[in-house]
Amino acid sequence: MSDSESEEATKINTDPVDNAWSLKIPAFKETDNPHGMIEESSFATLFPKYREKYLKEVWPLVEQAVGEHHLKAELDLVEGSMVVKTTRKTWDPYIIIKARDMIKLMARSVPFEQAKRVLQDEIGCDIIKIGNLVQKKEKFVKRRQRLIGPNGATLKSIELLTDCYVLVQGNTVSALGPYKGLQQVRDIVLETMNNVHPIYNIKALMIKRELMKDPKLANEDWSRFLPKFKNKNLSKRKQPKVKKPKKEYTPFPPAQPESKIDKQLASGEYFLNKEQKQAKRQQERQTKQAEAAKKQDERRNKDFIPPTEEPPTGSKRKANDNDSSDSRVDVQSLKAKLLKANKKSKS
């Protein structure tokens, strides 16, 4: 190591970092690895049948893109696989991982124009599996559609806020962009599949973006500015009408139930002889029969008992008086009418 290189090493800043995302990672150059790779590395991935036509059309562009990094790409239409390999000229040890991510994204229906961006140093990708996060298929489809939004509006807003390309395909969500944005996309997707609407996280990201512009709030807690949403999903369990109170906890086991002999000892029946027991049973039987006969007589005589009449109230009494006055006939006037009628008939 020369003196100039040792001086540069001593000038490295060791102060605490306020924002780790703002740090620039030094670029890896060809001079850092002049001898290349010792062994050949390769990665292969399968692709579905419906992607065969598209991949066949863009494969010359794929070979050109990986050829700039001294890699080799192969397309096997018989087995339905894509392979990327290192060559003797390959000097970047991590570029094979980037190329593997590129062919994985292309197999997940990501277009080549977007997938080739993953070969850049500041760009990464994340394939989020969402198929096993929800048990019922109806709920899974509903929450996945909630992530896309009406006419793709929700997905577009996520892309604008995170600077990432997001594609929802089947049981996976493919994201491509800066590493900070990938972290935010993963959080939004997982919370959406856990029944948290994505609009809440989008609103929080918009507020954070505005707060980042104010340097006075750099060292303050932002939780007071962020919206707090309460869960409105109430328990759908039907509450019983009569709730049984819980018994007090006792460390001792419950008392042993009394046997037939214990009950006979308590009542004194155990010490009676056979004739006395039979007489007691006969007496109990007679008392039961007498009670049953009494109840049966009451049930039979119930129909012959006259109902109790209520005494008439004041209004009813007046109505009865009016009816009786109307029903009275004037005998004298009736006689006079009859005499008149007889005279007319004689004349």
Swiss-Prot record:
Q: Pfam families this protein is in?
A: KH_KRR1_1st, KH_KRR1_2nd
Q: Where is the composition biased (Basic residues)?
A: 231-246, 337-347
User: Looking at the keywords, is Cytoplasm present?
Assistant: no
Official protein name in the record: KRR1 small subunit processome component homolog
State the superkingdom.
Eukaryota
Return the GO cellular component terms, semicolon-separated.
Answer: nucleolus; nucleoplasm; small-subunit processome
**Any idea what job this protein has?**
Required for 40S ribosome biogenesis. Involved in nucleolar processing of pre-18S ribosomal RNA and ribosome assembly. Binds to RNA. Required for female germline development, cell viability during eye development and for survival of dividing cells and epithelial cells during early wing disk development.
Q: Transmembrane segments in this chain: where?
A: none
Where in this protein does the record put region Disordered?
A: 231-347
UniProt keyword annotations, A-Z = Coiled coil, Developmental protein, Nucleus, Ribonucleoprotein, Ribosome biogenesis, RNA-binding, rRNA processing
Q: How does it assemble?
A: Monomer. Component of the ribosomal small subunit (SSU) processome.
The UniProt entry, under PANTHER family, shows:
HIV-1 REV BINDING PROTEIN 2, 3, KRR1 SMALL SUBUNIT PROCESSOME COMPONENT HOMOLOG
